Amino acid sequence: MSVAGLKKQFHKATQKVSEKVGGAEGTKLDDDFKEMERKVDVTSRAVMEIMTKTIEYLQPNPASRAKLSMINTMSKIRGQEKGPGYPQAEALLAEAMLKFGRELGDDCNFGPALGEVGEAMRELSEVKDSLDIEVKQNFIDPLQNLHDKDLREIQHHLKKLEGRRLDFDYKKKRQGKIPDEELRQALEKFDESKEIAESSMFNLLEMDIEQVSQLSALVQAQLEYHKQAVQILQQVTVRLEERIRQASSQPRREYQPKPRMSLEFPTGDSTQPNGGLSHTGTPKPSGVQMDQPCCRALYDFEPENEGELGFKEGDIITLTNQIDENWYEGMLHGHSGFFPINYVEILVALPH
């Protein structure tokens, strides 16, 4: 910096100290200017905080945000493509549901239901990723550009204006001791900076409808996300309700204990295989010859209508006819009647 420049900086510092410590009066800016300056300051603080809070809203886990930021920074340093996106909570939940749905398998109700809901959660995570991208492009990035360009430029003009004001006020106090031309030039520079700062603030505040458009983009992105989320959840709800309906229409299976082990003690020199342990099975119902069409009852069936044949679980029923795809006709204990096919298992099929 030149000697003249150092001298000017010293004069500004002297004037600033005299105002703060000595109570000297500086040149006052008009109320309209100060109101614009206040609004610009609020706008600047609002932009910064809203950007931060929006990112926290979209990506609520601070640890995941920090890790993602580090990965993206390292990828940029290495010249690699952008790293992975934010791990959505819906994606993590989907992964767990799909994993355990596969482990449980399809021969139960819970496993397939987990798979369906897990798939819905995966779709929700993809929609959430789209929301993140949409909000960043149409809301966060424009606000960042506003902060980095327009607001930073205004701050530069205001800082320059303050420096020229201090220079003008310092010289004004020494009027008569310095050349009038030097004071006049200081006033012209002050007025010039004031006009530039005033104009830039006015243009920013006058065009604030752009920020309204950006807010609208934020709301529209959220609306689209929630529409798609509702559609996904409604579809999986229908499938789950259908599963519940089908399961409730199926007869409930009863627990059938397996044969218990019995302990047989050897007599004399005889030996028993398996260390003297044997299995005793439950006796099979008798009274039906297994060379004729018959079936075994899987569940109890209580007749509700005339002509139906009631039976207990494990009964062996003689088959006489198949009425249709849902009903058999058979005999048990001298009684004849109809009963549902899905309540029995075939031992000897009816001849075709």
UniProtKB/Swiss-Prot annotation:
Monomer; in cytoplasm. Homodimer; when associated with membranes. Interacts with OPHN1. Interacts with SYNJ1. Interacts with DNM1. Interacts with MAP4K3; the interaction appears to regulate MAP4K3-mediated JNK activation. Interacts with PDCD6IP. Interacts with ATXN2. Interacts with ADAM9 and ADAM15 cytoplasmic tails. Interacts with BIN2. Interacts with TMEM108. Interacts with ADGRB2. Belongs to the endophilin family. It comes from the Eukaryota. GO terms for cellular component: cell projection; clathrin-coated endocytic vesicle membrane; cytoplasm; cytosol; early endosome; glutamatergic synapse; Golgi membrane; perinuclear region of cytoplasm. This is Endophilin-A1. SUPFAM superfamilies: BAR/IMD domain-like, SH3-domain. The gene is SH3GL2. PANTHER family: ENDOPHILIN-A1 (PTHR14167:SF50), SH3 DOMAIN-CONTAINING (PTHR14167).
